[in-house]
């Protein structure tokens, strides 16, 4: 396996580990701070799918219960995709497209909650855009080297 192919696989693995760890960190109460008074979701609101577990991971990234679960799933898929070149390439391409669209949605005020399910505003926008750019580079831009074909014709 050549270096370019391994780079695609390592990209899927690193993004997978990053998202799995961030998703798991969202369940650690000491790493999630409550929103400020008068914030996007007041602490005293009735629980719904959006406000369940809402807080700021590391004080920076808005998150909630569903967002943490999605990050763990996306991360797990990346870790599994690492096992093959085709899987890693497909993961990197799909991740780049999906997370670029999510970053764009985060810039639009009407879509900053992923249709009322997950927060994608604030620091989530640049984080999603940055990871989409990295995955896009390894999924689309970096040339994929294939094994040279062997000439199997009989010699005369």
Residue map of PLM features:
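Membrane-interface extramembranous regions
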Residues: 1-156
